[in-house]
Regions:
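Short amphipathic alpha-helix that is part of the acyltransferase structural core
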Residues: 2-64, 69-71
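Conserved acetyl-CoA-binding loop-helix of GNAT-fold acetyltransferases
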Residues: 126-143
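Amphipathic coiled-coil/heptad-repeat helices and related helical stalk/stem segments
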Residues: 53-54, 105-106, 136
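Hydrophobic, Leu/Ile/Phe/Ala-enriched alpha-helical segments that form helix-helix packing faces
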Residues: 35, 72, 139-143
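Flexible, charged surface loops at secondary-structure boundaries
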Residues: 62-65, 113-116, 143
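A short helix-loop-beta-strand connector motif used in the catalytic cores of GNAT acetyltransferases and
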Residues: 59-80, 85-94
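Conserved acyl-donor/pantetheine-binding loop and adjacent beta-alpha core of acyl/acetyltransferases
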Residues: 86-119
Length: 143
């Protein structure tokens, strides 16, 4: 009895595994397809409630002196966001980040319009898999 079940079961199992493998490969291709059509844009504001790292920071802070917000847009929807600041030193706290980015901005207005030497990404988040890595690569290509 077991031999009969074993003989009929093995081919069906192998066929099902092959079919599942095809479906899985197709789904993986579709999973990252959105990355190819995404574009990097500079944002004037973002939904701070979605920020898992620093939701306490306002949009005014994020777009203040020497600070910018970038997003990855795909089909009219933002899928990843990155906030960063230009500074001349590496800050240890958010207060230091604010002071250093403001200072770097003021120095740039008096000099040659080069805002800070260091770009600090102080918050990055993504709604889709692969979005965080994509936005980091694209923003640092741009700056």
């Amino acid at each position: 009895m077991i031999k009969i079940l074993n003989k009929s079961f093995k081919p069906r199992l192998k066929a099902r595994i092959r079919q599942n493998r095809r479906v899985l490969n197709k789904n993986l291709d579709n999973f990252f397809e959105w990355v190819k059509g995404a574009e990097l844009i500079e944002l004037q504001e973002c939904n701070v409630e979605e920020d898992p790292v620093r939701p306490e920071l306002s949009n005014e802070f994020r777009t203040g002196y020497g600070r910018k917000i970038f997003g990855v847009k795909y089909r009219g929807e933002i899928h990843a966001v990155m906030c960063f600041a230009y500074t001349n030193e590496i800050p240890r706290t958010v207060d230091e980040l604010e002071k250093m980015s403001h200072d770097a901005y003021l120095q740039s207005t008096l000099r040659d319009q080069n805002i800070g030497r260091i770009a600090i990404a102080y918050t990055v988040w993504s709604k889709k898999k692969g979005g965080g890595m994509l936005i980091v690569k694209e923003v640092f290509k741009k700056i």
